[in-house]
Amino acid sequence: MWLLGLFCGLSLFLLGGCGGGGGGGGTPYPVDRAVSVTNKGNYYEIVLNYNEGFSPFEVGQEYGRKVLATVPGYESALDSYLAELAEKTDFLYQLFLSRAEEIRKNLDATYVEELEGFADNLITENKLGDGRLSVDEFFLLNLVPDVARATACNALAVWGNRSVTGKTQLVRSLEWFSGSQEQLSRVNAVTVVKNGTRSYAMVGYVGMLGMLTGFNSRGVFAAVLDSQTGSEYSYTGCRSYTFDLRRAVENAATLSDVADDMRNPQRNYTVNHLIFLADGREAWVLENNFRGLGTNVSRRVRTANSETNPGFNPGIAWGIDESIAAVNSFVLLGNTDNHTILPANAMRWSSLATQLRLAGEQVTGTELKSVASYSSTGKPGNRDQGDLYSTHTAQLLYFCPETLELEAFFRNPSVAAPLPDKPTFQAVPVTF
């Protein structure tokens, strides 16, 4: 009897002293509940739940486990994508890995833990094009915007009297190299990070945890656009601007919060870029110009009033009130002129203005989406000819910051027919 009592007491002690798995003692449920990965047809809905006290490593680890179990051919697709970025040469492959290793040192600790958790599911050996994703390759994948540049984008917003709702409406186009086999198109993703009042969503790709496009539960929207100036690439001591943008949006209550964070002179980035910002009342463009030629190269915010003060560089005009646009160029007076000399920028800017004027004095959501879908050929066109919907379009988004209404068009994973003649937007529910 004494032995039976001791056994029962010991059993109760062991059962009572163990947590629910992954979250430590006292967690209400296993870490399995920290992450969901749901196939929505042409994109994956990812939910990373920090509301129950799971650590970044635990969330990342569960995310990686579920991706490998849920997303067919994930490793082979992304490994081959990285090989194509490196032009299948070991020289570029090693160069990109070394760049990523340097930038990785300057990531916020929370994001490093999350990435390391995901990578805990991967192999450690680096081998170009082996069909497996290694730890270092996964970090490289997440730092592609900082390491290997091959993108183009545009964005447009209207508000006030120019918007039929009186509130901000915007469209954003992401034009990325999707891979010769549409590798990225297979892993389109909308990732929702649930973290109390600091919850936010990111539109991008499965496993990529920097912010290309995103918004928080307070209606602050941000999106990145490249703006190369021809200046020498430098990565020593640099940070990742997509991960810094994630942190800024996560903590922001206003557009100024994001802009001030991202233009902090203490933070060095590999390349010049733009941040398209919007809330329910207006939209801005942060011109993060820190290298290049110009009479006043600087990191400044452009608003709807900037055309008159301080003005635009010679040869650039917009002239449409209560609206703002961005392509892959700086336009503020004194910043590097990578606009008038590059047809893809000047022509797309002109198309945005022309199509917006054709929409009339008050713009509906349907009309704004039509502007974003413009092509002179009636099918995916050429950026250099001013086509906004081009053969490189990867994602098209329509968003209302006031209501958090999101609609999206995602490039198809079909190599034979990745894009229809006209994009069709679908509602994308986001719940915080």
Residue ranges and their predicted role:
Residues 140-244, 397, 406-408:
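Internal mixed beta-strand/loop scaffold within catalytic domains of large alpha/beta enzymes
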Residues 1-5:
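Bacterial N-terminal signal peptides that target proteins for export
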Residues 19-20, 60, 166, 219:
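Glycine-centered flexibility sites
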Residues 10-33:
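Bacterial Sec-dependent N-terminal signal peptides
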Residues 26-152, 249-432:
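C-terminus-biased signal that marks the final domain/tail of proteins
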Residues 10, 26, 210-217, 302:
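Intrinsically disordered/low-complexity terminal segments and short unstructured peptides
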